[in-house]
Structures are given as structure tokens and as C-alpha cells.
Amino acid sequence: MYSGTDNRLDMTFDTFKKIVDDTGSEIFELQLEGGEPLIFPKIYLFIEYAIATGRCAKVIVLTNGIELEKNLRRLVQIHQWYGTEFHIKVSVNYHLLKVHDNHLKTLADLVFATELLPKFNIELNTRKRHNDQWIDAEIDAFGLSEINHSFELQSYGRMTGSNYDGVKIVQNIDSWEIYAVDGKCFGIDLVARSEYEKKLAEEANNEHD
């Protein structure tokens, strides 16, 4: 989704339910992303509804990790209750490490706390500026290199027009789709969805002014 700080839009449960129900009898994986999904009030309603269909093979949460410590116990409880596989993908970048002291130490502690849960996985997705190799070195110092996927920033959204490469899509399934906050499907076009949601956010903000 568009993750600007001016975004006041949340997906409704009815919209989410329709997306899930429209998958019919198919087995699916649910990926929740932001903004920041761990501050979304209905995140657990969404997760448990998807799992309750009996067709959700995996829950994936994309987070900056700041609220993960507060939410970890509940996420693990849902995982253990239903037996559904969970993947928590934590974004790491220069800004997060400079603003939040001990961020990597906290993440290392959370990884250690869940290491005996083979189907509850925490991974790092590191986005680097040019010359940010020091981030990989810090991640290695905390023993997190094995779960780290390191990339340079991508030229879309706020970074459109920058001297970085375009979008690189990494997925472990062949058939997947992304949805905007209002339920509109964009296939696999991350850029189009980002621009669409940016426009929705601007329109919503204009209505509040």
C-alpha cells in the first residue's frame, strides 16, 4: 500500500472478507502490509477470519518491527492455536536504525524467543542506500545474517526518479494478486497500486481540510 504519513485510509472488514471469499475453494496465502499492519486495529480480525476459512496455508506480515515486541505473544498464540504457518518479514533500513536505538538487538531477542517454533519465522528485508554496506555488518554482528535478505532501495513510490533500479518482486508462489485499501485488484503491479493509494489518500485529506 501507499505508506505516506498522510495516509488515513484503512481497509474495511467487509472489503477484506469479500477478497477472501472470492478466492472460492482455493488454498491461499495471506500477506498483510502497510503502512504498518501491526498498528491496524483490525489486523487480528483479518488474520483469524482468513484462517477460519480452513484454506489459509500461510500468514505473512510485512512490518518495520517497531511494534513487533508488543504483538509477538498474540501472533504466536494464534499460530499455535490454529497451526497455521507464519512469516514475519521485518524491514530494516538506515532511518529505522538511526531513530530506534537497539532495534537490531530487540529483533535478535525476538528471533531467539521463537527459534523453537519451526513454522513461525522472522526474516529481515534490508533496503539499503548506496554505501550502506555497514548495515549488513551490523546485522551480522547480531547473528542475523542467515535470516537477512539484503537489497538496494527501489525506484518507485517516494523514490520514483532516483538512481536506483526498478521494482524487484520476490514471491514464493506462482499466482498472487495485490489489492488496494478499497479492494481494487492490481494484479502484481506494485507501482500502480502505490500511485492509486497515494491519490486516494490525497483525496481523503482534501475532504478533511
Language-model features, listed with the residues they occupy:
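Accessory C-terminal segments flanking Radical SAM cores
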Residues: 143-209
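Eukaryotic C-terminal
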Residues: 121, 135-150
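Radical SAM/AdoMet-radical enzyme domain recognition
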Residues: 13-33, 40-136
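Canonical Radical SAM [4Fe-4S] cluster-binding loop centered on the CxxxCxxC motif
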Residues: 1-14
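Glycine-centered flexibility motif
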Residues: 4, 129-139, 153-161
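Intrinsic disorder/low-complexity signal
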Residues: 28, 35, 206-208
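Short, contiguous strand/loop micro-motifs
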Residues: 6, 33-34
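Aromatic-acidic/polar surface patches that form glycan- and anion
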Residues: 9, 39, 178
